[in-house]
């Protein structure tokens, strides 16, 4: 009995400590890459929902729309599809050393289009953009603005975030990764979950959360479920890099993509692999909320939103399947071990739908 009580106390202390150690940050390289993308006309970085900060950004950087770095950013978007999380993938692989932008980490992690880019030339032009625009001066002028919001986010959202849940849910182990929560003041309603690995260091997990002002409220809006969502991506996305798992999903994936695209007016997900990953991440958020003690009504609201408005009508089935996984961890040590069951769940959903409608999904 004493051991049980001690274990509970130690678990609570570990949880509080883990959360307390995660400081909400602003990253100069995240803002740099985001503002470069905005100046180059990337739509997903041009939502312009940050009020006065957006106005300041436009006034400061508009004169540089013909800059060599901006022209290159436009070129690599057109040729290689660089955008969305790929921009942020570059951002987390950049550092600033004595006022100079440098690449850090493993270049092989810069894929999905970046492998086709001359990275040395890109960084050279990015340094010129950094210097010519006096970017650091802009960044420091807004330091108080950044700090005020990160403190607000820290106070209101971080107490609901339990990083140890993720390693336990996905791996069945205690946490070994390092979480970073970064506010992106340029990407508006978009947020991203990424990871990187420095040699000899724990894996770094990044939840990059978009800042936006709700026009109806006239103040910044933050939703804790966005953090819960993005924190899952570094665990879920690598599973579909495995050829074995790709083979499991390659038939049902395109059908789910077709269903998703037909159920929403506009989607940011043009590839079936993204839809599979998003499905798992969104289902995991519901389980997280259940395990974190959210009211059933709140969990059902999130589930209903994903099914009806977000274009993932199979979410109810997937949440049930993942709950089976959590109840049988003696059989499935990791989510990767359970991946064949996930594929079967999604296949069953599609088969049932085709049978009910009498139509084949293409």
Question: Which residue stretches match the model-derived regions?
Answer:
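Pan-zinc metallopeptidase signature
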Residues: 283-362
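N-terminal mature-domain "stem" immediately C-terminal to a signal peptide or N-terminal signal-anchor/transmembrane
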Residues: 21-101, 310-335, 339
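Active-site recognition of the HExxH zinc-binding catalytic motif
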Residues: 221-242
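Active-site scaffold of zinc-dependent metalloenzymes
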Residues: 102-113, 186, 191-221
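Auxiliary, metal-adjacent structural segments of Zn-dependent hydrolase domains
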Residues: 143-201
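Long, mid-chain structured domain cores
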Residues: 70-163
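Post-HEXXH active-site segment of zinc metalloproteases
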Residues: 238-264
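Bacterial Sec-dependent N-terminal signal peptides
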Residues: 1-22
